[in-house]
């Protein structure tokens, strides 16, 4: 139903979720020649760039980020900022059932967002395959970033900035 309303241009449809990037590369396996040893340096702890993104089917993406864990307060602040951006049609934000999306501070804002034609729609439990922004996060982690991008924190941040900017998705506040 929501896709039909979007297709008929009655609404703007956004898929939203968070992801985290740190200095541990996402290497599911590694090949090596016989009798040679591959070394992958493990890092413990360290910094993490947490992002909350809202991606439309029209190709628009807004990303909010911070280096401390994402909580309900951050989701609320991000959605409040997003609700102030001009939009000619009602917006529907599709979210999964993560605890931060159901935080009381988020629920307290629902009426305010509804007054500016922004509604939240929660996906069924255990259905990340229905949240299209998950594909973007997967491409970032497994396709666009490679081993050299994880050498330092500044290199990883710079690379993420390039990845999102080159896709037309600069990092926001």
Predicted regions and their residues:
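Short functional hotspots at interaction and active-site rims
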Residues: 1-173
């Amino acid at each position: 139903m929501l896709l039909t309303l979007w297709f008929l241009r009655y609404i703007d449809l956004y898929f939203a979720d968070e992801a985290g990037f740190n200095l541990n590369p996402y290497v599911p396996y590694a090949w090596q020649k016989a009798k040679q040893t591959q070394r992958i340096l493990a890092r413990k702890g360290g910094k993490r760039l947490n992002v909350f993104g809202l991606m439309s089917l029209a190709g628009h993406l807004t990303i909010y980020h911070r280096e401390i864990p994402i909580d309900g307060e951050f989701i609320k602040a991000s959605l409040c900022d997003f609700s102030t951006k001009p939009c000619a049609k009602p917006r529907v934000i599709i979210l999964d059932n993560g605890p931060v999306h159901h935080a009381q501070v988020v629920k307290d804002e629902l009426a305010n967002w509804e007054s500016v034609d922004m509604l939240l729609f929660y996906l069924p439990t255990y259905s990340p395959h229905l949240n299209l922004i998950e594909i973007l996060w997967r491409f970032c982690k497994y396709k666009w970033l490679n081993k050299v991008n994880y050498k330092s924190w500044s290199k990883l941040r710079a690379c993420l900035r390039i990845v999102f900017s080159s896709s037309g998705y600069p990092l926001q506040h």
